[in-house]
Amino acid sequence: MESIGLYIHIPFCRQKCLYCDFPSWAGREGQMQMYVDALTAEIRAQGKRYENREVISVFFGGGTPTALEIPMLAQLMQAIWESFRVMADAELTTEANPGTLSYEMAAALKQMGFNRLSMGVQAWQNEKLKQLGRIHTIEDFLENYRAVRQAGFENVNVDLMFALPGQSMAEWQETVRQIAALEPEHISAYSLIIEEGTPFYESYRAGKLELVSEEMDREMYHWTVDTLAEWGYGQYEISNFAKAGRQSRHNRIYWQAEEYLGMGLGAHSYMDGKRFHNSYDLQKYISAKGDTSLFREDTELITETDALAEFMFLGLRLTEGVSFARFRQRFGKEMDAVYGKELQELTELGLLLRDESGVRLSRRGIDVSNAVFERFLL
């Protein structure tokens, strides 16, 4: 029986962060229950469609899932348990941003079946959090983190961001050290990207954002990799670090080009050799009441050429790289027969490392990873 991951999108926030370009809104509390009812209907419909698939991972993202009321989250989780074949050892994660968490919420999430929480902290300094448009202070986070542990969560991820406007190396080092000292099981560290259509983008266009240099961005990144290793966090993907045995199963589904089903507003899926996503129109989604034919958009049949390229550039995000055996098993071909020229050139440039089991990015290759990935687009 083939396994899949589920992604559930919750498009509501208390306040939208200034750098965020995800489909989400603040101040729509009046539409939450209608949305949850529509999403419940989609979950039940898709459960019938994919009743023969085992679910090894469920991930609630957003937005801020914990902006919903406890009964709404319970309604969604109940629909998943009743509609899908969720494995006993499945990883069940929800994003839970500081400022929307409490012991009561954390305990309720545990009761619903969640066994992993992902907390978006981003920075340790309150002035930086305010600059990002975050609703929490670092004191709020610490209180929430203690509540999460008290509620029994033994698998917690903390999201951090570096290369923030005006951020010094000392500020970033303080952030990483303070978070590592709390010993979450998993840490994600992303470089800030200024996305078009966000308030940050408008400030950038107006020359009001003091961005760090490319050199400082890389210096921060390399320091993070080395420092987290000293704290016992193994880097397993370009931006992700975990204690032994705590890698995110849901993340690995994406990077190993395995199948996942997205449900909710704007959610993306990769199923049955096709990519598709749901509408980004909230009213359209709610009105459809779970009828996917009314809100599914941009269905794309993945050609073998596409599948080969995606397998390589997604897999190379993992520090273990792409194994020759997995490539052969997936496509019935040798990697060298398809990408021999590219592999040789990238290896000679010192951007790829090759051994008898497969290929992976070198440290320098990680720094120019997008340029490396482009080489696999045939």
Identify what each model region corresponds to.
Residues 333-345:
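Short amphipathic alpha-helical interaction segments
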Residues 366-378:
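Short, amphipathic alpha-helical interaction segments positioned at domain boundaries
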Residues 347-357:
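A short, conserved structural fragment
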Residues 11-22:
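Local cysteine-cluster metal-coordination motifs and their immediate loop/turn environment
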Residues 358-362:
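Minor-groove-contacting beta-hairpin "wing" of winged helix-turn-helix DNA-binding domains
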Residues 6-9:
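Short active-site neighborhood of thiol/selenol oxidoreductases, capturing the structured segment around
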Residues 1-4, 24-48, 53-333:
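C-terminal scaffold of the Radical SAM
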